[in-house]
């Protein structure tokens, strides 16, 4: 089974730039997209019924903000977008799909870059989310977490760690939560196969030439619970 995660930064723009063609060429079984920035009434029939895929959406109340969608060829046993938590449910950040062998969480985690209040919200989201995944995992089924985590975990995961020790997305308290996730038995699938630095998923558009010079951050991840380790055959970052 092939899974892909992608922060599209606006699904309508990505659609015009060839998202359907990309999906067809990728031959993914499941595609998880984040930051769709779309309202329910703006989702077109073509977006809902991408050939061969069922789609499941979570949208934010705020227009043009957040949102995630999961495109799945296999039909899930169950789908959830609300979890009885104001912290987790408020901004359209999670789609959970259940399959015979695992639960899949497609998540757009909050960004802490707008000050102390948003950092506190991000940390609360992190903690409530981990509690949610652990409850499901304790019932005996493995868990996959993918999406934009909005944190670079280690110094290997960004080009200039020393410059960014107090930057949103690399503060010690944010990184500690990713370490906590790993300590709970969730494996960073990319690091199973790649141990060197220099591999990133986000480049700041405000930095001139950041992508060309590969001055980036790895903030997008696939984590799998220990039970699923033997099922992971490959992991990488698409160009």
Annotate each predicted stretch with a short phrase.
Residues 1-9, 101-113, 146:
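Active-site-proximal beta-strand elements of phosphoester/diester hydrolases
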Residues 7, 23-41, 104, 133-155, ...:
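Active-site beta-strand/loop signature of hydrolases that rely on acidic residues for catalysis
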Residues 84-85, 110-126, 162-166:
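Surface-exposed cleft-lining segments at the edges of enzyme active sites
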Residues 11-15, 89, 121-128, 170-173:
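Soluble or luminal CAZymes and related metallo-dependent hydrolases
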Residues 119-140:
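A long, amphipathic alpha-helix that forms part
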Residues 37, 45-112:
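Structured beta-strand-rich core segments of catalytic domains in phosphoester-bond hydrolases
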Residues 25, 40, 79-83, 155-239:
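Metal-dependent phosphoester-hydrolase catalytic domains
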Residues 1-50, 54, 60-66:
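N-terminal, active-site-proximal structural segment of metallo-dependent hydrolase catalytic domains
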């Amino acid at each position: 089974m092939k899974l892909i995660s992608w922060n599209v930064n606006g699904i309508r723009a990505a659609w015009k730039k060839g998202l359907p063609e990309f999906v067809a060429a990728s031959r993914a079984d499941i595609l998880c997209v984040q930051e769709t920035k779309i309202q329910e009434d703006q989702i077109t029939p073509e977006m809902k019924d991408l050939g061969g895929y069922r789609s499941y959406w979570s949208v934010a109340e705020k227009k043009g903000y957040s949102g995630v969608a999961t495109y799945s060829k296999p039909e899930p046993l169950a789908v959830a977008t609300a979890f009885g938590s104001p912290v987790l449910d408020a901004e359209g950040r999670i789609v959970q799909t259940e399959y015979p062998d695992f639960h899949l969480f497609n998540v757009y985690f909050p960004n802490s870059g707008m000050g102390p209040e948003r950092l506190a919200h991000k940390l609360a989201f992190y903690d409530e989310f981990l509690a949610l995944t652990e409850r499901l995992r304790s019932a005996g089924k493995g868990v996959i977490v993918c999406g934009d985590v909005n944190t670079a975990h280690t110094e290997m995961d960004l080009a200039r760690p020393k410059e960014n020790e107090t930057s949103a997305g690399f503060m010690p308290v944010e990184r500690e939560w990713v370490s906590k996730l790993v300590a709970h038995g969730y494996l960073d699938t990319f690091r199973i196969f790649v141990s060197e630095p220099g591999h990133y998923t986000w480049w700041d558009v405000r930095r001139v030439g950041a992508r060309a010079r590969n001055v980036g951050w790895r903030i997008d991840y696939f984590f799998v619970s220990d039970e699923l380790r033997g099922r992971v055959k490959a992991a990488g970052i698409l160009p």
